[in-house]
Amino acid sequence: MIILDFGSGETCKNDEKYVEKMIDSLAMVDKGDKDIVIKWQLFNNIPYKDRKLSALKPVIFLHAYVYAEKYGYKTTASVFDLETLIFLSCYDVPFIKLANRPELYEYSRVIRATGHKAVVSVGNSKLFSCLTKEHESVIPLCCVSEYPALAHDYIKTFSNLMHEGLSDHTTDFFLYHTYQPKIYECHYKLEDSTGPDAGVYARTPEQLKEIL
């Protein structure tokens, strides 16, 4: 499975047409050989430098969810607070994602209580192993929360675990080709995308051709 992080309201500017452009552009390079899940970011209030990040509006998420269905794509999101977790749990989603933030890990039990799987990015091998043993519906991904991150740091931290699951913040597909992870996540952007989630570690449709 390939999870593409479409970002928050920052990347799409909460614009329905830009959301459609992002999804259309993915479909144009998708050969249909991989199980692709579109993942957004849902939160109410996250500070960023000297301002707050632009949250994805619920109506925009709904539009993205419905629009992606026309291509057969499943849509979900990372959640950063209880309110957005409850909001997302009302949708038919393949899983609910938690970022590599220790304060969010307790939500994995709440997610399980809603009947959904939890995919959780973790920053060390010990926690990866613990979550693997916790419950079959809690799925960890190896993650280095640097933007961009170095492949060396992933290898040093996770070595032989990356074939199970990888949230990739490097700038190329070296780790993907080397470890062939069962679940692979990376950020997604268009050539003209802006915002904190559209850095050099985010992949364009043209770049995704390498693995699709």
Across the structure, where does each feature detected by a protein language model lie?
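Catalytic cores and adjacent flexible loops of soluble metabolic enzymes
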Residues: M1-L212
